[in-house]
Amino acid sequence: MTGRLSSVVFDCSDPHRLAHFYSELLGLPVTRVDGDWVDIGDGPTRLSFQHAPGHQPPRWPDPAFPQQVHLDIHVDDITAAEAKVLALGATRLPSTEPGFRGYADPAGHPFCLEWG
């Protein structure tokens, strides 16, 4: 049997806020809101956000609070993209890899903007 990825699910304390962050960042519509569950994306694969009571955000690169998911997002203009993610509530993380910049989303999940 071959499976098909239908959703990448983020645990977080505020699924509505985190869904808005990624909806704005990726230009994907909110397609489902069901209490403490929110989906974005109208294709065969979506991002989903669920309320997790007592959620402890990762503190990358601290191994005591490891990352739980990691997205790499390709952008054409790193300067404009960085301004957008920071305005949406992201926090810049230390990163030294050429062509990548690390950030934490509003729930603390790390992600990278990549370019080039």
Residue ranges and their predicted role:
Residues 2-6, 28-72, 83-106, 116:
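Vicinal oxygen chelate
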Residues 14-29, 81, 85-87:
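Amphipathic alpha-helical segments
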Residues 9-14, 74-75:
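Short, surface-exposed ligand-recognition loops at beta-strand->loop->(often short) alpha-helix junctions
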